[in-house]
């Protein structure tokens, strides 16, 4: 397992990390806490994974408690990432929540500090290695108090690196662009980026290169929600609680057709491993967070760090296929975020952040 660094922070992480949303939310099948802890320990002990990405909203703190159980006696050997911003403490909102709908978000300094203290308690630690604001939207990007709070938490030693996680849809282009313009000392951005879903991630990378010299990226949904694992067919039926069950059938059919164009990537590695190597070819990618939900996947994806890099010809062919949408004609992607540059008039009409 190779490692990369968040520049200027002292934080070094494995090229392949482990995102705990597959273990703690039930959206990828149910896992007991004992099963989750066993997988986390195997990731570290057997495969050299050192970066573990949680969020307070994953299972209402469950992912953080799983980390504390798995690594409580060896805290200094692993790197914890977590995310804040959803008000998981609002009982009324929790009871009214339906399915995977979003909880209310809060980014005022007092709430952020409260959320961090609760994360520290659940993680059973006195510092967080990487803290990101979870699914920030444009009003939060434009709230300087939120980012000053992140810097203050860093000075106080409660966090070592800070940034933002964009989603849950793959949009949010100008949220990220404006963030690196406004806060050029930001350490990291978490975003969706993969061979099949290159936009808007590529544009986010270009913005960081232009404005934020030390901003690196931790990548989630590395396999296009499983499509790049190369295991699905047009007849696949996802389990009842699997979030992909609720996607339109065209997502599955078109995805399978796109994947069939990528056989040339599997001459020296599995498609899943080659998909991670495609990401790792970008120097600003500090770590990848594939969705891991069984031991076989864990072994396959962790081995991707040592898999042969893609050749220049393979990289060129992927780029050419992407320009042609992998030979598939489909409706344009719809996004939840800001995919056009807001004008000054738009900004004036936008909701303003709450007072601290």
Predicted feature residues:
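Conserved, mostly hydrophobic/aromatic
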Residues: 6, 18, 36, 52, ...
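Beta/alpha (TIM)-barrel catalytic core signal, keyed to glycine-rich beta->alpha loops juxtaposed to Asp/Glu
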Residues: 3, 135-329, 339-356
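Alpha-helix N-cap and loop-to-helix initiation/capping positions
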Residues: 28-35, 62, 66, 100-111, ...
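N-terminal small/glycine-rich loop or linker at the start of catalytic domains
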Residues: 9-28, 81-103, 130
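Acidic (Asp/Glu)-rich catalytic clusters
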Residues: 8-10, 69-76, 120-124, 151-155, ...
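N-terminal binding-site loop/beta-alpha segment at the start of enzyme catalytic domains
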Residues: 1-79
